[in-house]
Amino acid sequence: MAKTSQLKRLKETLKKNDLTGQTNVKGNKKKMNSGKNRQDRDKVLSDIRQQFNPFDVKVARKKHDIGGRTVRGSVGRPGLSKLSGEEARMEARKLELQNKGRVGGVFDRRFGEGDSNMNPEEKMLERFTRERQLRSMGGGRNKSIFALDDDDDDADADMMLTHSGQALDFKDDFDQGDLGIEAEEDEEMAAILANRRKLAEERGMGAMGVNLEEMDGVDMEEAGTGRKKSKEEVMKEIIAKSKFHKAERQAARDKDQAIIEEMNDEDTMNALIRELGSIKAKKVVTALDQKEKEYDQNFRNMILDRRAKPQDRTKTDEELAKEEAEKLKKLEDERQARMRGEVAIDQGEGDDLDGNVAFDFENSEEEGEDDEDEAEDDDDEDVEIHEVDEDEDESGDKSGDESGEEETTKSEPASKSSSSTLAYTFPIPKSHKMFLETTSAYPLDQLPTIIDRINVLHHASLKEGNKERLAKFACVLIDHLMYLADEEEEDDFECLSEVVAKVHTLAETHSPTMAAHIRKKLEAHQADTTVTAGHLMLWTLIGMIFSTSDHFHLVVTPAVLVMTRFLSLSTFDSIPKCIAGLYTAQLLIQYQRIAKRFIPEIAVFLGRLIAALEGTETSLPMASLFKIAPIKGFTPGKASHKSTDKTISMRSANRSILSKKEVATLSQELHNQAVFSVSKLMDTYKDISAFPETFEFCENIPELADKYSRITKFKLADRKPLTLHKHRPLAIKTMAPKFEENFNVDKKSYNPDMALQETQKLRAELKKEKKSALREIRKDAAFEAREKIRERREKDDAYHEKMARLVRSVQTEEGAEKNAYERERASRKRKR
């Protein structure tokens, strides 16, 4: 059987469905009328079109076909979807081209809003003027006399004009009540008005030949008969009434004019005006007028005030430091000149220029440092540096004398002998040896002044490299403090507090360099168990400069290790060593006042020290590791339990030779300080679980026994017996398989974890939407490119067509001219 072509099969199919062939057959006419309608015909055509165009249908074949299951989207019509997409893009492009270059907005057509040269008052005045113009053009006296409507029926009757929130009504506010007119004159005026109305009625209706009674009778008669008026009668009545009212108003105006002329002739109005002039209206002062009056008064006062003079601007820290350095250099030059005899005596003497007198900033700094020291003494009680006197009475008298001497020293100016030799400029030392050479020529009480002047002369903002030099100078001061603490002189400790304050100020800006220097000091002292007052000063500075509450600190942590090693490995066989150990324990307690980390060496040392001073044994755990040998020159005995809140001084740690009286006094003070330190340690460690075992030795100390029993009672009540951990019971492992009831083999994103399943679902949706968006963007870009190419081609075709048309027209004209030329030429040849 031969294979038929697709065109032939299409013709046969169309003919079979009665869509082609002869249509004017009589027998077929009845069949067509009773056959398919237009919708059926379109459906048949669409089926035939789909049948003969297999490329317009896309079917997604499945690997496994399951009967009875339809998958959505398995059959698609890419051609139709592409066509619909093209149409939608074409409509969107048309809308975009229509709106291209258009800018929407609201036009403000109010008076004066478009004029930027008018202020708000001018705008309101312009609006007011235009409103009055509209009123005058639409009503009032300019109305035609033949207008049928009344004056009160104009279109602008209900319109109200406002200005600054106040209504602008143009009614006359003339009130007769305040004119002083008596009742008789009022009655006379009422009679005049009544006569005027009566005269107007007579004149108006008489002129028109209309009787009011007759008009009323006609109206009543028509109302009684119930006959409807004709249009002509209604118009006549309206015209008559309008003319009547016009005539009435004209008569009233004439009557008023006559009365006015009569009053003018009798000089009545002049007398009335004089009476009105004599009446003084009471002025009402409102709150707004009072505010305006106060404003005007304040404005006049401001005008009369003197102009403020400009003050000097606030100077920066760098500028202040520069000025102070220049002052010091100038004073040093003057001092050198006076020393050489180059300056006259009447110019002033340098003996009166002491460091604390010549510069206010030094006094302010010292006062600030004293305040800072007082604040630090409140927080750091163990950092106080004072003497331990033989008895309390003597110490009180001595301290009173010292305070009196200090006040006298502050109130009186410095002596000539000390200030005359003190220079104003000093080189910044690079080592402790160089600093000793600089300060050796001056008294020790001038050391704070020397440090201040070095800081001012070498401020970090004055010269490059001064910051590093000051950091090195801070390290030199630390070495010098240790040097002063190790000296035997009593006066050395009086200036330590001032120098410590200077070091604390330098540590705020040079802490990294100082930390590295202190770590080197700690490493050098690590192998040595002997402690001097210099080491105690170093540990005190560490607690003042750095934070002791950090879990790990580059300086504090090594310092704590060195201090605990000293408490555990040193042999305390003398009063000075015991003082050094007690001072170290107090520093450690102060270190842990915030963090409260447990350091067992403190409690064990204090317990052993109290036992050695009282001559009793202790039952502390691991007590054998802390050796406290018998104290030389001291006979243990029952000490008087008298607590004190004073901290131990580091001065006695350097004293090697003590008298028996001093040993007795120091041992008593040592015992009191140890008991007080244990009390502070109990407050610090009262929350730890091992409190009863740690402070068991306090039962034998009367001052601490009650406190220990109270805290121990609560700690023992909080303890619970040791129990095993409670574990969750584990199920026995079984080999039975686990089935999922809602398992779906077609669901690729199945996951027993619901949260993870939701996450995967969101990711899949995001990926799908992203691919769809990218696909649409590509289609839009391709459509835009095709449209641009089509438009460019249309423009090019139009241009080429235009040029071809011009060329053709030119060629036509040239041909015509050429033919005319040839004809003329031929005719001339024939004439020859």
UniProtKB/Swiss-Prot annotation:
Localization (cell): Nucleus, Nucleolus
Q: Which residues form a coiled coil?
A: none
Q: Which Pfam families match?
A: Nop14
Q: Where does this chain mainly localize?
A: nucleus
**Region annotated Disordered, chain positions:** 1-43, 301-334, 362-422, 807-832
List the keywords (alphabetical): Nucleus, Ribosome biogenesis, rRNA processing
Q: How does it assemble?
A: Component of the ribosomal small subunit (SSU) processome.
Identify this protein by name.
Probable nucleolar complex protein 14
Q: What organism is the protein native to? A: Yarrowia lipolytica (strain CLIB 122 / E 150)
Q: Which gene encodes it?
A: NOP14
